[in-house]
Amino acid sequence: MSEATALSPAEFEQALRAKGAYYHIYHPYHVAMYEGRATREQIQGWVANRFYYQVNIPLKDAAILANCPDREIRREWIQRLLDHDGAPGEDGGIEAWLRLGQAVGLDPDQLRSQELVLPGVRFAVDAYVNFARRANWQEAASSSLTELFAPQIHQSRLDSWPQHYPWIDPAGYEYFRTRLGQARRDVEHGLAITLQHYTTYEGQQRMLEILQFKLDILWSMLDAMSMAYELNRPPYHSVTDQKVWHKGITL
């Protein structure tokens, strides 16, 4: 039996971009937010839970750096850490997200405590970080390619939220504006790594599965939020109205 023929770089890129059909911009929770149908609680819940993703992105990127022997790749990839953590004496994306939290009426200390993070969101994000630690650096780096679709989702918030949610302080939108440029830059680097590394049919199909894994993570996070904030079925809702779920276990 002959081996399947690898996709050309252009065909492979097209296959990667086609995965955008499953990006979480199409999740009903996101659709409700940018159509102006989300409640204050639903937006606050999204901001609070997404903060857990934000603070873990630098851990994911640090894992990629730790596993990468290529100095030139590390020199460029480290910018992602600085984008989120901030350079010495400068704020980064995490501080910008805390300001978004304040803009929607959340206390920064409550966000930092992560007490509002739903178990389903925590499990999804933790799975992503653990994947980055255990995978080879090329696979972990390529898993970030959901950034191919990120500028569209940031722009949709900037276009629709000020119109639909006048109660949100506009200063909170700084994160989305900043990420528009950063995401486009990151895509160029991540896509170059991916197209160069995956040159066999089997490798390309594996990469498409890895990208789907990342899409599954983002979609599953919103599924958990939908249960809690749209259907009013948070964890243990049938036995208690208290937030009894674990708030994170440090190993």
From Swiss-Prot:
Pfam families: TENA_THI-4 (PF03070). Disulfide bonds: none annotated. This is Pyrroloquinoline-quinone synthase. Its EC number is 1.3.3.11. Pathway: Cofactor biosynthesis; pyrroloquinoline quinone biosynthesis. HAMAP family: PQQ_syn_PqqC. GO terms for biological process: pyrroloquinoline quinone biosynthetic process; sulfur compound metabolic process. It catalyses: 6-(2-amino-2-carboxyethyl)-7,8-dioxo-1,2,3,4,7,8-hexahydroquinoline-2,4-dicarboxylate + 3 O2 = pyrroloquinoline quinone + 2 H2O2 + 2 H2O + H(+). The keyword Disulfide bond does not apply. Keywords: Oxidoreductase, PQQ biosynthesis. Coiled coil: none annotated. Belongs to the PqqC family.
